[in-house]
Amino acid sequence: MPELPEVETVRRGLEKLVLNKKIKDIRVLYSKTIVNEESEFIEKLTNKTIKKIDRRGKYLLFRFSSDLTMISHLRMEGKYFVEPSTKEVEKHTHVVFDFTDGTSLRYNDVRKFGRMQLVKTGMEIQTAGLAKLGPEPKEKTFIVEDFSKNLKRRKKAIKNALLDQTIVAGLGNIYADEVLWMSKIHPETPANKLTEEEVKVLRDNIIKELALATEAGGTTIRSYTDAFRHSGGFQFSLHAYQRTGDPCERCGTPIQRIVVGQRGTHFCPKCQVVKS
């Protein structure tokens, strides 16, 4: 699943490709992608212009003229590409936005899990998923005191807590493993057992790691590509995720894989010792 760095990379690419383009027509090839009534979705967006593209956590927010916002969640395999409107539609393409300039924005999703929802701008914060999102992992918004209070209320494993989007927005399996390795925290450590210093280090590493991954264009493990069809570059900088058996870059101990909360989890058994 694309995490914050991948979604932000897609957002940046799309802003270069489709900003200020006007929709001429919309072709919905898989109706379940659209949360709204399909006819209403098409009618309301036809002749509208993309004015801006924002991101909140793992969600893309397409801002259209007439105060309309399309919420787009890529889920597992969702991708956006821009092609000439006359080009044959690729397999697994579910929605095509044809623009007046002869190009089209195409949503492609092998797994069919991605969704689009059209709302009045300002109402997106009340929709399921967005309503309870935690803070963005940035210096000004991700406050260590609030992070600490949230963790103190939770007995579950810190790995699971980091995947909880109400605590901090944008982390997924890849970067949760990475920031825990960086912070020398075992993924099964109860969240409420972390010291104040560990919480601070973890918070700082979350901000740092996601920023670095974003600048590298995200991480491509299997199929992720950005709007230009480019793979990410951060997979070459991973320390723990999917490095089972490789020596830890700090101590040389082989990285191990366990399952935490039904998620494959990678860590160093020497650097990251579990707390009971």
Curated annotation (Swiss-Prot):
Entry's EC annotation: 3.2.2.23, 4.2.99.18
PROSITE patterns named among the record's database cross-references: FPG_CAT (PS51068), ZF_FPG_1 (PS01242), ZF_FPG_2 (PS51066)
Cofactor(s) annotated in UniProt: Zn(2+)
Record's cofactor remark: Binds 1 zinc ion per subunit.
Taxonomic superkingdom: Bacteria
Record key words, sorted: DNA damage, DNA repair, DNA-binding, Glycosidase, Hydrolase, Lyase, Metal-binding, Multifunctional enzyme, Zinc, Zinc-finger
Record carries keyword DNA-binding: yes
Catalytic machinery residues: P2 (schiff-base intermediate with dna), E3 (proton donor), K58 (proton donor), R263 (proton donor)
Catalytic activity: Hydrolysis of DNA containing ring-opened 7-methylguanine residues, releasing 2,6-diamino-4-hydroxy-5-(N-methyl)formamidopyrimidine; 2'-deoxyribonucleotide-(2'-deoxyribose 5'-phosphate)-2'-deoxyribonucleotide-DNA = a 3'-end 2'-deoxyribonucleotide-(2,3-dehydro-2,3-deoxyribose 5'-phosphate)-DNA + a 5'-end 5'-phospho-2'-deoxyribonucleoside-DNA + H(+)
Keyword DNA-binding: yes
Residues at which DNA binds: H92, R111, R154
Molecular functions (GO terms): 8-oxo-7,8-dihydroguanine DNA N-glycosylase activity; class I DNA-(apurinic or apyrimidinic site) endonuclease activity; damaged DNA binding; zinc ion binding
GO annotation, biological process: base-excision repair
Pfam families associated with the record: Fapy_DNA_glyco, H2TH, zf-FPG_IleRS
SUPFAM superfamilies: Glucocorticoid receptor-like (DNA-binding domain) (SSF57716), N-terminal domain of MutM-like DNA repair proteins (SSF81624), S13-like H2TH domain (SSF46946)
Gene3D superfamilies in the record: 1.10.8.50, MutM-like, N-terminal (3.20.190.10)
Subunit structure: Monomer.
Membership in a protein family: Belongs to the FPG family.
Function comment: Involved in base excision repair of DNA damaged by oxidation or by mutagenic agents. Acts as a DNA glycosylase that recognizes and removes damaged bases. Has a preference for oxidized purines, such as 7,8-dihydro-8-oxoguanine (8-oxoG). Has AP (apurinic/apyrimidinic) lyase activity and introduces nicks in the DNA strand. Cleaves the DNA backbone by beta-delta elimination to generate a single-strand break at the site of the removed base with both 3'- and 5'-phosphates.
Protein name: Formamidopyrimidine-DNA glycosylase
